[in-house]
Amino acid sequence: MSTSQLILELSLIGTMQLVTGVFLVRSYDKTDSVGTKVQKILTGLLGAFMVMAGTVKFFDPFTTMFAKQIALSELPFPTLSRWAGQLGEIFAGLLLLGVMIGNKALAAPIKDKAMQLSTLLTTAIMIVAVYVHLLPSVPAEVLPLQSKPPVMTLIILGLAWLNAFLYFRNE
């Protein structure tokens, strides 16, 4: 891994942590239940992660790895699949960050729809990712963390479902 790539990754991770941290501090409320606090933190972290995961796929080596994953998995409409994956991750993350940032300013039905849409997008993207991970034709070298078992993918999927559960339980 080159120095410029490492700097790019660290700057993206640091920026997302900073943005998430600032908005979590701003939305802190002493009267929130433990479930609500966990849900707010999870919303921010998932949102930041999804934006970052979609964004890094515009830069090498991630763009090359992502293109190889799609080509080797023989997903239909490879160009559309690539753009849908990248922009879907970014949009799902932005929806989650919007819910976290606009918690008090947004009307409840808008927040509810944003949470539902982000969970639906994340679920669809992660199911496709699990499929790609499990294909024998896709080597570990082109997968995130170069790991063949879809552990990270399933963790993100589980956290997205937990986040939605906590959000709608607190409503």
Question: What are these model-predicted stretches?
Answer:
Residues S2-E171:
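Membrane-interface extramembranous regions
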